[in-house]
Amino acid sequence: MGLSGRDLQTYHLYHRSLRCYADNFLRFAETGVTLLAGTDLVFADSPFAAVSEELRCMVDLGLSPLRAIAAATGNCARVLGMQGEIGTLAAGAQADLLVVDGDAAAEIGALEQVRAVYQAGRSLPLPLV
C-alpha cells in the first residue's frame, strides 16, 4: 500500500529536510563548532527516537565515535556551564552511567548493547523502555 496526499507530502518534506540537515551537520562539524546530541525532534514520526540512534547517524555522516559520544556528554556539560560537574566520569562529578558490551569509542553500535544502567549511583532494572 502506497502513501498518498498529506502522508506523501510529509514523507517528501521529511527526506528533503534530512538531506539538508546532513549537509549542514557536516559543515558545522568541519568548522569545529561544539556539537550537541539531543532528544528534540522536528518530526513526530522521526526515526531518531533514541540518542544512540542520533549518535549512530552522526558517525554515519563522518564524525568519529568518540566525538559523537562527546556530543551527548561532555559537550552538553560545557554548554550548560557544568563542565566537571556532569557529563564526565571523575571524582566528585555527578554521573549517570551506561555500561555496554563493546567499545563504543571504536564502534558506536556498542551503545545499543546495554549491559547495565546507573542513575545517580543506583542500578536501574533492565530492560529500560
Stretches with model-predicted labels:
Residues 2-11, 17-100:
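His/Asp/Glu-enriched, well-ordered alpha-helical/loop segment
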Residues 72-74, 78, 91-129:
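C-terminal cap of metal-dependent C-N hydrolases
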